Every structure is written in structure tokens, then in C-alpha cells.
């Protein structure tokens, strides 16, 4: 039952069943265009499979379905508003629609990747409605309602297929990853204490950051499966923070050991070097370490080690509750209540603007070309431009996604012609034969989609789109060729636009992310208890993971970012003297650090960065004047020296 071939075949059956059910119910319920139901069932089922490279989890399919419903409703409302306001000016209607598509793409580039699909869909849904009802604008409300109904039917069929063919729960994968992360955390600490080679430590914490991020991303899929996982979800959210704290403490231990190798006693080092390959062995190891720490003088144990043991103990407690999904006891409730993560601010503003411009300009060019030439395939071409540019922008490689669409629509032409001209006309008298013929196509493509074959997803969607499954069926060969040609030209234009309008915001976004780490470090300089109690680790590591995705080969950037995260944690636990003058100076430093992020001029950025360094030097002197402890002055001095050393990378 768990053999890879069986799982691939099972998903292919799921996809075939979802498409066939949507087709049958669409005709049975006398929907005008069952094609939308079939297309929705195909995209909702196959899209997550293509992204995952295998059978998707049940939560992923339902999450995709909800996003499609939300995006469709937003797009329908947007389309209706545009038509009501500009019904007497068709050109203005079309241009406003292009502007709407660009704005939706811009928003989709700013929100979380998991939710971006809804806004991308909203952008081109309004365009589809306006283009389709261009000659009969008074029927737009009816068309919008019908489209929403067809979309919901397709999603219901996709979810039903997943439930019938053994839904794949993500819970077992979460349990396995929770255990793996704990073992890897212990191994990272051992590497940092030895200490091992930098490259080996880099690989270890890099892998841990990715796995911890993946574990946090699985929460939404788990909640989509069933509401009974709410307790698990709460525990996983805090477990994510504890895992990030473990990474930070281990890496800080490495930095401390690099400068002061004698800080850890030989006895403690021997205990930490003992092997532990399972969570049970690590549990026993934590017992020994807690007893040793309790019996030792507080100054004999480095703060990073005692903090690491405390975080690992909380991790073990939460992981047990995650595996059993038992009721939350009072100890766990205290841990859960103490976590208040801060939401991260997107650093992709410029990148999002470029994405919105790409979609808006490309769609407007397609629309103007259609109006100027009167080309019968112009509407389909324009819609395809909007679809490709909206959906491709949020992927790691937009050009690769656009190429996938282009290959898919080219392959869909002969396959669609075979179905439209020969197979479907031959099955007109039998719904069973029609369902079997379409089911076979879905089954074959369902296997290829899981292999992430170039063009597989585009072939499935484009073939369903051009064979025009309407009620009643009309076999107009010229209309078929126009639709197929419009798809091909639209995808080609989209690829050309992506190649011509280059996104040069990568370096700028990377610099902004690094300066956000600087801001987070200096923002820890505060005496406000509420601000000091905020949990910045999830937001900081989300930005670090984004840096990893953008610059996969630039290890120096990761080290700098991680060092700044460690600096933030050091300053956050430092007991800063409560003083009105120091508090006012804290605000001034934060304001300067924020200006380093927000200014667009390089010369001004250098000015504010130099001013930030000057203010940090003045702040150190103020701490000396107010007779602050050396434990307070030292972290500020380290941060200042680090910023001065790496200022070329930050400005």
C-alpha cells in the first residue's frame, strides 16, 4: 500500500474520478459549461501533485480548493463592479480589467506563498468574465453566478475523490519530521561543541532551518484535514519557535567556543558528546543534563547550553502531545500561552511591483492587439496571458513555469484535436463512453504530473479548455482552432514579456532582508517589557529562509544573517538599565535603522548607516557613563564591530 508505484496509480485514479465526476454531474445538473467544473477538478487535484512531485496531502487539495473558491468570488465581484461602472466604454472596461489583474498579481506577491493563488486567480477571473460577456454585458451577473456554481461543483468532486481513494494524511509525516528535527538538533549542538568544520556546521543548520520551516508549513494542511487537530496545531506553532531557539543557541555556542574554548568544562563536554540517535535516547540525555546543571554553579554552565537544554525539554514535552493529540495539561498551557510571535514584514515590495507591472502591461498589450486587429482568437490569447503571468510570478522560477505552460498548450493541440474531432463526436450517444475517454486521458497525465514532467500540468488544463465541454456540445472546428491558437500565442507572449521585463530586484530584496536583521537586532535595545517579551524568532527565520531561497550558493549571507539573529537574542536577554535618556536614545537608534531600510538612494543609505554606527558608539559611551554592567556593554560593542566589518554587504 505504501509502494511508490501504488501511490502514483492511486493518485491517477483520484484525478480520473474527480474529472469524470465533475463531467457527469455538470451535464446531469444541466450546467451551461461543465468545462469549468472539469477544469476546476483537474487543477485542484493536479496542481498540488505537480508542486509536491507526488501524491498531495488531503489538506493540500482542500486548501487549494478553498483558495480557488475565494479567488473566484473576489474575481467575480471585481468583474461585476468594473462592468457596472464602465458599461458604456468597452475599451476602458478592458483597460481597468488589465489594471485589476496587475493589482491582484502585486498583492499575490506580497502575501504568503501558500495563499497567493487566491489573488492570482481573482485577477484573471474578472478578465474571463468581462471578455466572455463582452457582447452581452447585461448577462454578466448570471454568468458570474453560473461560474461560481461550476467552480464549487468541481472542488466538491476533487475532495470527494480524495476521500474515496484513501486520503493521504500529513499527520504521519509530521510525526516523523518532529522526531528527525530533534535528533538533528542534538547533532548540530555536538558539531558546534567539537567544534566541527564550518562547512559541516553550515550544512547541518541549513538543513534544520529548511525542515523546521517545512514543519511549520504543514500545520495549515493538517488543520484542513480535520478540526480535531486543533491541539496539535497549537503545539506545532510553539514547537516551531522552540526548534528555532535550539538552532540559535547551538550556533551561538559555536561562536562562544571559537573565542573561549574553555567556557565549557571537560565533564559537560563529555556528556554532550554522548551519542543519541532516537528521541527516547535524547530524552534520557536531557534528564542527565538537567541533573548536572541543577547540581552545578550557575556560572559554571554557559547560558547558551542551559537555554538549549530548556528548549529541548519543552520540545520533547510538546512532541509527545503532538504524537498523541491528547488534552493540553497545565504545564503545556503555560508554555503555549507564553508564545507571542511577531508577524514578519514583506521585503519584496519592489519585486511585487515588477510582477504587477508584468501582468498589467502584458495583458494590456494583448487586449489592445485584440481590439486593433479584431482577431477572433484575441480573447483567448488575452486570458492566457493573464493566467500565465498571474500564476507564474509567485513560483521560484517564473520563466520555467511559463515554459511549462507553452509546452503544455502545444502538446494540447494534437491531443485536443483528436478528442474534439474524433473521440467526443463518436461518444455523443453514450455518457459512459465520454467519461471513459476523458478518464483515460486524466489517468495518463495524472501519472506524468507526479513526475513533474515539463508541460504535463499545462497539457491537462489546456486540453480540457479547448475541447469546450458545453451543454449542448457544438463541434465548430474553426472555433476550436481559434481557441488553441489563442492559447499558444498567449503563452508565447507571456514568456517573451517575462524575458524582456527583467526583475532586477533580487539584490535589492536581499539587501533589504539583511538590513531587517540589523533593525531587529537594534530594536532589542529597549526597556519596554512588552516589546522584550515579543517572539521575533519565527519572523527572523522566515526572512532567513527567504534569503536561502534567493541566494542558494551565498553562504556568507546566511552566516551574516544568522549572526545578526544571535545578536538580537543576546541583546534581548540583556538587562538594560531603565533610564529616560537611554529610552529616548533607543528610539533614535531604531529610527535610524529603519531609514537604512526605507531609503531608495544609495548615498542616503550610506549616510544613515554611518549615522547608525555613530549612534551605537555614542550609546556604548552612555552605558559606560551610567555604569552599566559589562554584560550589557559587550553585546552592543560586538554588534557595532560586526556592522562596521560587514557594512559593504549591508549598504
UniProtKB/Swiss-Prot annotation:
Bilayer-crossing regions: 11-31, 41-61, 67-87, 91-111, 119-139, 150-170, 368-388, 405-425, 429-449, 455-475, 481-501
Subcellular locations according to the entry: Cell inner membrane
GO molecular function: transmembrane transporter activity
Its job: Forms an efflux pump with AaeA. Could function as a metabolic relief valve, allowing to eliminate certain compounds when they accumulate to high levels in the cell.
Organism: Yersinia pestis
InterPro entries, per database record: PHBA_efflux_AaeB/fusaric-R, PHBA_efflux_pump_AaeB
Pfam families the record matches: FUSC
Protein name: p-hydroxybenzoic acid efflux pump subunit AaeB
Bilayer disposition of the protein: Multi-pass membrane protein
GO cellular component: a single term: plasma membrane
Chief localisation class: membrane
Signal peptide (UniProt feature, chain positions): none
Gene: aaeB
Family: Belongs to the aromatic acid exporter ArAE (TC 2.A.85) family.
Biological process annotations from GO: carboxylic acid transport
Keywords: Cell inner membrane, Cell membrane, Membrane, Transmembrane, Transmembrane helix, Transport
